[in-house]
Amino acid sequence: MSPLTAGQAGTSFTIDYEQPGSGQLRARVTGRRGGLETLLEYWYAIADEARRIGADMLLVVDELAGDPLPPEQLQGWVGAMAGQGFEKFRIAYVEADGSRIALLEMAEIHAREHGYNARVFGNESDAAMWLRHGER
């Protein structure tokens, strides 16, 4: 799969896709973190690719540089994801910067309240294990 490079003014990101197994999509996101619009842009791109290949499990590895969104924008992000089909995916999200895990766990709680089967992890091996074998 060829990578996607995109981003708005002042931000840029690249998504490298792999298919580690049947029904799975691994998306590694690198580059510069932007605002809510950038976050939505890369998540929509990942969902499009997952639908294109027929994946139902997403492993998203976030290696973006820059400051995370504030909590109120993370809540807005969860709401903006409605109607995009994310409810159909099992999503394991890996945050490379361990200091951000607590903030992202709040987003995980909001996502679960909105019907998403998603978890946040600090490392890829735990995320991959949950994706394949964790509680459904």
Where are these regions (language model features)?
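Amphipathic, Lys/Arg-enriched alpha-helical "gate/interface" segment within cytosolic domains
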Residues: 2-136
